């Protein structure tokens, strides 16, 4: 831990940039063979020619594919990426079987889930999530700031330094921002066209709390703030792979950089070779033959000139076999990269007829085996943090019952839970044991699997009881009327059959 009280943010930043250099070089090398704009060379600007270093778009497409799939998994558009799960034991102890109270809690959870999901969409957090994932795939480390009710701000590697503990978690981080307009509450000592604002966040060794302090040109600005723990900070550091002894996290693409580099070199070789091989050049034997180059050049299409066919030949590179070798190698590496970056194009087997169902099944198997590990790296750290931040902004609290925010595979495992319940219900039906099942509980569970808001959709227990009572009363009344009509009919029949009954004898 650092002595935050005696540490100047700008001095801390400048003294730790040297540890960052190897990770900058690694990120730039990966970007140069994939998406150069993600990590541009130091000193480049909007006028710099970015794609001079790259010879193909394949690597960039794989990175964008993985980014899209991870983004859709972390923030799926059709359902919530999290679950609000109440403490089951507390529910039993508190409500003691009161189904009306339990339904009220579930409706409250459903409404809050919708409110959180809507707020995430309104703040356009999804687009910032894609930018953050891109940084982690190509660069490895990134810092995110959650702006209150205003989405997120992404800070790439060249804008911050960090100190990590023995588990790869941050102990201190400092961010530099180049601003023309300073945030509210920060007054500089001197007026400038552009300011460099340094923000230091560090764990205080004495209080075990996080402190945030800022400076411009070494002069303290703003108000020093204290946060109870790391989760309370508006800033959060995210990294991909970390190895003991590393100063920063390593990117996902580093594992596959040799293959990406080979694809780029082979693509350049095959492209340049194809251009040369496709070049149309005619060779004319003027000295020993009867054909003149000028006659051939000036001849119109379909013209007749003096000459001999053997005097004219077309240039041929005759490197077809060599290009087949390089093309084959490029194809093999591309298929391996497609599998590693979750591109479903890699699952299609080399055959004349491949059904869509076959591709779908193989793609599901690929993503089930690979995406689970990739996705789990981000779900708990990012999803739970962002959901908690949005809940704080919306002042959503649960006082009666403790509620856990489930993210990651626990949240996305709802389809498997629904399938298990389907199988269970089929088995119960086959055994003719449906009378043991609480229908309302079944409906609530199915709705929770898909994140459906049940408020106003599913009847409450009280409504069902009222309807059942009304139906029973209607049935009883109908039965009474029918029995009365039947009795009256029987009496009338007796009177017709025996008209003298009751008369004088």
Task: List the predicted regions and their residue ranges.
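Extended, helix-rich architectural segments
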Residues: 1-182
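C-terminal anchoring/interaction modules
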Residues: 1-25, 38-42, 283-505
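A broad, structural surface signal
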Residues: 2, 110, 114-122, 131-138, ...
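Structured, contiguous alpha/beta core segments that scaffold functional sites
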Residues: 13, 138-139, 145-299
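An N-terminal domain-start capping segment
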Residues: 36-63, 120, 177-211, 295-317
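Short, hydrophobic/amphipathic alpha-helical patches that form generic packing surfaces
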Residues: 69-76, 257-272, 444-448
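Generic amphipathic alpha-helical segments used as scaffolds and interaction surfaces in large
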Residues: 96-107, 116-132, 247-257, 317-324, ...
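Exposed alpha-helical structural elements
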Residues: 104-107, 111-115, 124, 128-129, ...
